Amino acid sequence: MAYSTQRSEQLFTAAQQSIPGGVNSPVRAFNGVGGTPRFIAKADGAYLFDVDGNRYIDYVGSWGPMLLGHNHPAIKAAVLAAVENGLSYGAPTESEVLMAEMIRQIMPDMEMVRMVNSGTEATMSAIRLARGYTGRDKIVKFEGCYHGHADCLLVKAGSGALTLGQPNSPGVPADFAKHTLTCTYNDLASVEATFASYGSEIACIIVEPVAGNMNCIPPVPGFLEGLRAICDKYGALLIIDEVMTGFRVSLQGAQGYYGITPDLTTLGKIIGGGMPVGAFGGKKEIMAYIAPTGPVYQAGTLSGNPVAMAAGLAMLKAIQQPGLYDTLAEKTRQVAEGLKAAAAKQGIPLTVNYVGAMFGFFFTDEPEITRFEQVSRCDIDAFRRFYHLMLQEGVYLAPSAYEAGFLSLAHSEADIAETLAAAERCFAQMK
């Protein structure tokens, strides 16, 4: 069957009449690569199937949650069983207790956990808690890092904000944004200088331990340790945003992988197993400040939803199987190193980063990418061309040069081989 996008084009045209930009999250609109977004009809294992009948090997994984692959039987069974008992109660359930206990067991630095509905809710609530606990207003974040779309975090943000060229969003009052101080990721000197000026006013640092919203940028040695030391020195809290890296870089997330102890952690994506779930947690003395035990208010009609908790519990049980993360890391290494080798064979400069089950590639001749300013200098036009060539080959990558890629347990050796063979053909067309 010839490759066609006719039905996706029809749906995108219709969607733009009813939905702003035709999508419900900006990066899905393909603004970063041009063309028509593929409308997906179903997903299974490592594959997406669009409304035109095209099959794609998927390296987006619903932007991170699908660590085990799409439509995993254990998660699907748990959801179907939970649905039999009702969709939502607005009251406490056993499943949310079990979920919190399992998170604590896996990530012991999260002594108490509050469930929410998204990663944005988790980061927004954690920052409010940090401000309430410390009695300070200012926060520190990093240019190009993305922590959701709360007002205080849309200052020099990453992810779709970078894709759209709007790192400072209209609608965020200047009086509000002034409390957000922005530093350079992987540059401790910029953090130290900021604290030297505002240390007594800073409530927290919030950081992606692996920056996954300006592509994939792991921390340089000593960076996370330095943030911990600075927070300790000035009495600020360290919030590690593990919405993307949690249970993906390792079972204990990036904090376990790099051996860093945060004061607060935010989670999302994988903990919902594909359902909308977020969480934040940390030291008991800090979490005690959250209502109803403390004065910092946070609430949610659907928080701890029983169907979502069932999916999350099934996911967290499944990912604890021995050897799973070694397998994922090896699959990721094969894809990342394979892309690099395929590009080199065609004389195309490509730098690749990867850690755990996430990876990123950059069209640049710089041998190492560790900072946002380097990402911004990469060849975006080359990425766009490569993206569309790969899409026609049946490989679905994130439609933005600023987003990381994700492996799942469902990706087979054959899938990886097919991906790399496709990449070599695409690179050959780009010479």
UniProtKB/Swiss-Prot annotation:
InterPro entries: 4pyrrol_synth_GluAld_NH2Trfase (IPR004639), Aminotrans_3 (IPR005814), Aminotrans_3_PPA_site (IPR049704), PyrdxlP-dep_Trfase (IPR015424), PyrdxlP-dep_Trfase_major (IPR015421), PyrdxlP-dep_Trfase_small (IPR015422)
Domain of life of the organism encoding this protein: Bacteria
Classification via Pfam families: Aminotran_3 (PF00202)
Catalytic activity, as annotated: (S)-4-amino-5-oxopentanoate = 5-aminolevulinate
Segments forming a coiled coil: none
Subcellular location: Cytoplasm
Entry cofactors: pyridoxal 5'-phosphate
Statement: the UniProt record of this protein carries the keyword Glycoprotein: no
Enzyme Commission code: 5.4.3.8
GO (cellular component) term, any one: cytoplasm
Modified residues (N6-(pyridoxal phosphate)lysine): K269
GO BP annotations listed: protoporphyrinogen IX biosynthetic process
Keyword terms: Cytoplasm, Isomerase, Porphyrin biosynthesis, Pyridoxal phosphate
Molecular function terms, GO-annotated: glutamate-1-semialdehyde 2,1-aminomutase activity; pyridoxal phosphate binding; transaminase activity
This protein's pathway: Porphyrin-containing compound metabolism; protoporphyrin-IX biosynthesis; 5-aminolevulinate from L-glutamyl-tRNA(Glu): step 2/2
PROSITE patterns noted in UniProt: AA_TRANSFER_CLASS_3
Subunit structure: Homodimer.
PANTHER family referenced in this protein's UniProt entry, alphabetically: GLUTAMATE-1-SEMIALDEHYDE 2,1-AMINOMUTASE (PTHR43713), GLUTAMATE-1-SEMIALDEHYDE 2,1-AMINOMUTASE 1, CHLOROPLASTIC-RELATED (PTHR43713:SF3)
UniProt-recorded name of the protein: Glutamate-1-semialdehyde 2,1-aminomutase
Organism: Tolumonas auensis (strain DSM 9187 / NBRC 110442 / TA 4)
High-level lineage: Bacteria, Pseudomonadati, Pseudomonadota, Gammaproteobacteria, Aeromonadales
